[in-house]
Amino acid sequence: MTNAAARDGRLLEIRDTSTPWTLRTYPTRAEWEARARFIREHILACTGLLPLPPKTPLKPRVFGRLEREGYAVEKVFFESLPGFFVCGNLYRPLNGARRTPAIACPHGHWARGRLEDSEMCSVPGRCINLARQGNVVFSWDMAGHRDSKQIGHRDFGGPREDLWGIGVLGLQLWNSIRVVDFL
């Protein structure tokens, strides 16, 4: 073993799901903010979003409002990139408040995406619950799911996309950033 390998902490202990993990603490706010900047930049670089693309107009369309007990739900689509659409549902409380907290609610890895409504999980149920608690909630399709079929969920990524330095993770992250802009 070389001296460099002997000092490599990854070679000293094999970690598994039973290994205790202590989160690093930061003695000052400035140290944490520096670390947060580093992490943010690292994520953007790894997803092909450094530098960030320009934020073009979203051109949102909100329509098809249905009112139910304590909430309303509307259909939404907007452009995260010129000609690329993010589709979803906007849940709003019916409490009449002018300003309410907003929640971006991704669907996770469920087979039916934002429309998953099973014993294990109900994405619409989660959104309805949050809206009835007074929050505006947006649940959107990941690329390749439900109404967002401009690209296939597993088909995006290859030599052409590599030339641009963006893959499906970068596209999903960019769509999520634009969801926050929409809210």
Task: For the regions a language model picked out, list residue spans one by one.
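Non-catalytic accessory segments flanking enzyme active sites
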Residues: L12-Y91
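Acidic, low-complexity proline/glycine-rich segments
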Residues: M1-L12
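Serine/threonine-rich low-complexity intrinsically disordered regions
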Residues: T2-N3, D16-T22, R114, V123
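A generic structural signal for ordered alpha-helices
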Residues: R10, T17, W21, T56, ...
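Cap/lid segment of the alpha/beta-hydrolase catalytic domain
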Residues: A97-F182
